[in-house]
Amino acid sequence: MNAEKAPERHNVDHEEIAKFEAVASRWWDLEGEFKPLHRINPLRLGYIAERSGGLFGKKVLDVGCGGGILAESMAREGATVTGLDMGFEPLQVARLHALESGIEVEYVQETVEEHAAKHAQQYDVVTCMEMLEHVPDPQSVVHACAQLVKPGGEVFFSTLNRNGKSWLMAVVGAEYILRMVPKGTHDVKKFIKPAELLSWVDETILKEQHITGLHYNPITNTFKLGPGVDVNYMLHTRAKKA
């Protein structure tokens, strides 16, 4: 097996992985292709920490961690963090940056389904940010996340709604007009309506706790959380207690 390529595994889109492999070296460039992720990370981290009752001392899994932006920030909060991704280059970047920063994060190249088969009910918090729209079977990812969290634990998802507004803002606006992310980053057909995501959640031990929109104002060039899930949104769920 070539370690530099994503192995042939269930629920892996190699074209999607290749997109992020190509720009992995610039993952921590605050003015590069991943600038929006750096900009919204404090909002994500704050939401996750607040809804989880803090992260200190908790065992956390970040599914689709990429270059480690969220994973590192959760480790800085005192969590014991594992990051999963199928991209070899992003994980190499994540490991190097963590080493340079003196932050301890375990990074693993495997699918969430594989990880769930070996680590069921081992995490206090599971995060899956902007990953569902990049895999062939997002429903399978939701089910695996539910298997990984401890009874009473928290699982967070973020993705993009599928409608005309999200296409205009996330694809036309962000990729072609504002050039906030590389062209071809998103495929509107892979976006997920909140009702679809909630239906998959309902098939598991998870229960919806809260949903919020993530909004960008191009005039003020700022991001904020708030009502309205027309474009980007985050969902907080909790596993039933045993």
Curated annotation (Swiss-Prot):
Molecular function GO terms recorded: 2-polyprenyl-6-hydroxyphenol methylase activity; 3-demethylubiquinol 3-O-methyltransferase activity; polyprenyldihydroxybenzoate methyltransferase activity
InterPro entries: SAM-dependent_MTases_sf, UbiG_MeTrfase
BP GO annotations: methylation
Pathway: Cofactor biosynthesis; ubiquinone biosynthesis
Annotated residues for binding of S-adenosyl-L-methionine: 44, 64, 85, 129
The keyword Methyltransferase belongs to this UniProt entry's keyword annotation: yes
Record key words, sorted: Methyltransferase, S-adenosyl-L-methionine, Transferase, Ubiquinone biosynthesis
The protein's role, per its UniProt record: O-methyltransferase that catalyzes the 2 O-methylation steps in the ubiquinone biosynthetic pathway.
Name used for this protein in its record: Ubiquinone biosynthesis O-methyltransferase
Source species of the chain: Salmonella arizonae (strain ATCC BAA-731 / CDC346-86 / RSK2980)
Gene name, Swiss-Prot/TrEMBL: ubiG
